[in-house]
């Protein structure tokens, strides 16, 4: 059950102090700092000055903030499991946790060469996290909602209703309207980043192979969990099919694309852990 909104009888300074003393406020602060770093880095990037001292600081600190915010969520989840006595079935449960995935990836980006595209998914997530926190926590703290008098004949045990600030309503409309499309955008950005890493491998850029392997593992996990990632890959495949199927396309190009799709499906089948968990064992080699 959600706690009641702050009371207007409590002084504003005390309400803000209570809000700032929570772990959730630290989570919100991390996302807010991440957004500030992304905007500042984008300003440097637009000016082709993304290797300046400030740009490098904002890039690295953005991933520090991302790791901190996702680390807080992972910690709170772990603590909740400890309190309720819920046990995980092994490391696979942790690896399937989306927050752990993004936590690990943030730490990877932190110590790897700059890939500006890597900031955007975290930035988009932070927009919605910050908006949701402002709507649910910050605005009610600054402007406590008024309780709505229950209509005549209402049950005395009915849940009390409160007025909602217009800004909170506007944020709620924004989140509801743009959340799904933004998650689809995140999926497309993550695929674009994967293609960028493939180019890095082809060009033999520093640490590209290990980064490509880690990110491919991440994206494979996201594919099995996110309908948005699945739809983004399906859209990419359809567009390339349409391009390759055009009249005048060399047969060699079509053959290469068919081989790529076959290899991708084989990779998906080999890395599908669900079939091993359901009792379908991997084939054994004959001695």
From Swiss-Prot:
Gene Ontology cellular component terms for the protein in this record: endoplasmic reticulum; nuclear membrane; nuclear pore
Ranges that cross the membrane: 19-39, 54-74, 104-124, 184-204
Predominant cellular place of this UniProt entry's protein: nucleus
Topological domains, Cytoplasmic: 1-18, 75-103, 205-287
Keywords for this protein: Membrane, mRNA transport, Nuclear pore complex, Nucleus, Protein transport, Translocation, Transmembrane, Transmembrane helix, Transport
Superkingdom of source: Eukaryota
Subcellular location: Nucleus membrane; Nucleus, Nuclear pore complex
Membrane topology classification: Multi-pass membrane protein
A GO biological process held by the record: mRNA transport
Perinuclear space side: 40-53, 125-183
Pfam families hit by this protein: TMEM33_Pom33 (PF03661)
Entry function: Contributes to proper distribution and/or efficient assembly of nuclear pores.
Quaternary structure (record): The nuclear pore complex (NPC) constitutes the exclusive means of nucleocytoplasmic transport. NPCs allow the passive diffusion of ions and small molecules and the active, nuclear transport receptor-mediated bidirectional transport of macromolecules such as proteins, RNAs, ribonucleoparticles (RNPs), and ribosomal subunits across the nuclear envelope.
Family under the similarity heading: Belongs to the PER33/POM33 family.
Name the record gives this protein: Nucleoporin POM33
Taxonomic source organism: Chaetomium thermophilum (strain DSM 1495 / CBS 144.50 / IMI 039719)
